[in-house]
Structure formats: C-alpha cells, structure tokens
C-alpha cells in the first residue's frame, strides 16, 4: 500500500495544482470520485489489466463511463494515467487529492461511529462541539457500529475519542485486572 501511495502522490499533486490553478477543486474532487469508483469496479479492473485493449480504447472507456462533462484538463489527466498505466492508482490518487484539498481549505475528516443512528440535530451539535475543540472545520462521515453498545467513537486525524459503552467497559476491565 505504501508503494501505491508513493506512485500515486505525483499524480495527486499535479491534479491538485491544476484544480487549484483553475479554481475548480470541487469539480476535480467529484471527477476523481467518479474515476476512482470506476477504477475500483471489478469489470473495469479486468479491462485495465486486459492486454488486448489499446490505450485509446481504455481512455475512451473511462471517458464514456466516468468522464461526462470533463474539462479538457481532466481529459488530459485521464490520458496521462492511461499512457503511464496508472489507472489502477485512481483510488489512491483520489484519497491524496482529498487530503491536499482539505489541507488547503482548512478542513479535517472526522469519522464518527455510533451504536445507534444520530438525528440531524444531534449530529450538528456534535460537529459544532468538535469543531470548537479542534479549532477547525470538519467533514463528518457517520457509520453505525452496534458493537459499541452505546455512545460514539470519533476519529479525527491521529486522535480517537472513545465515548462508547464498549470502550468504558474495556477501560473498567483493564482497571480491575491491575
């Protein structure tokens, strides 16, 4: 995986610089999402590794599947990936691009795992409290994890806040063993 990130980084950096220069970080991010989803599809993976498909055919396939409304710069970016046989790196390129975009915009990703669904008001309050604590804007991704029993577990960057019943029980068990 680290090797993939090393290979993907120059492409992500180039995409970010192009997007920032054009003032189009949002559209590039959406385009990379579509391209990464296409590259991760099993049938598209088979096409990428099929030696019978020419570079032109592969390029046209990706443009047809994910490239509706692409600017000439985005089309050229896809062409570079095809020519350098890097289409399989699109998920990593997208992830690195999002990191660069978030850093540029002063935003961090927050992953919130909850034992039960959070209503919009609760999520908005939690997000506001976290933004105040971390002094940054947050993009939140919420997932359900019934194994938490109750409460939430929040991961922002390298920091994890475990306010779940399962986490408290684990801490209690560790304290009793000592």
UniProtKB/Swiss-Prot annotation:
It holds the Pfam family OSCP. GO terms for cellular component: plasma membrane; proton-transporting ATP synthase complex. GO terms for molecular function: proton-transporting ATP synthase activity, rotational mechanism. The keyword Cell membrane applies. The keyword Transcription does not apply. Its main location: membrane. It is a peripheral membrane protein. Keywords: ATP synthesis, Cell inner membrane, Cell membrane, CF(1), Hydrogen ion transport, Ion transport, Membrane, Transport. It is found in: Cell inner membrane. It comes from the Bacteria. Belongs to the ATPase delta chain family. NCBIfam families: ATP_synt_delta, PRK05758.2-2. F(1)F(0) ATP synthase produces ATP from ADP in the presence of a proton or sodium gradient. F-type ATPases consist of two structural domains, F(1) containing the extramembraneous catalytic core and F(0) containing the membrane proton channel, linked together by a central stalk and a peripheral stalk. During catalysis, ATP synthesis in the catalytic domain of F(1) is coupled via a rotary mechanism of the central stalk subunits to proton translocation. F-type ATPases have 2 components, F(1) - the catalytic core - and F(0) - the membrane proton channel. F(1) has five subunits: alpha(3), beta(3), gamma(1), delta(1), epsilon(1). F(0) has three main subunits: a(1), b(2) and c(10-14). The alpha and beta chains form an alternating ring which encloses part of the gamma chain. F(1) is attached to F(0) by a central stalk formed by the gamma and epsilon chains, while a peripheral stalk is formed by the delta and b chains. This is ATP synthase subunit delta.
């Amino acid at each position: 995986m680290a090797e993939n990130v090393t290979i993907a980084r120059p492409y992500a950096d180039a995409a970010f610089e192009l997007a920032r220069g054009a003032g189009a970080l949002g559209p590039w991010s959406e385009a990379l999402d579509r391209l990464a989803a296409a590259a991760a599809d099993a049938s598209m993976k088979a096409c990428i590794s099929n030696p019978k498909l020419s570079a032109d055919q592969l390029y046209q396939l990706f443009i047809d599947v994910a490239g509706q409304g692409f600017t000439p710069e985005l089309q050229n970016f896809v062409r570079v990936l095809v020519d350098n046989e890097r289409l399989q790196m699109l998920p990593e390129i997208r992830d690195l691009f999002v990191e660069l975009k978030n850093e540029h915009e002063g935003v961090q990703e927050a992953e919130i795992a909850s034992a039960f669904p959070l209503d919009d008001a609760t999520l908005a309050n939690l997000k506001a409290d976290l933004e105040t604590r971390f002094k940054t804007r947050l993009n939140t991704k919420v997932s359900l994890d019934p194994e938490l029993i109750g409460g939430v577990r929040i991961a922002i960057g390298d920091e994890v806040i475990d306010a779940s019943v399962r986490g408290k029980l684990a801490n209690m068990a560790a304290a009793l063993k000592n």
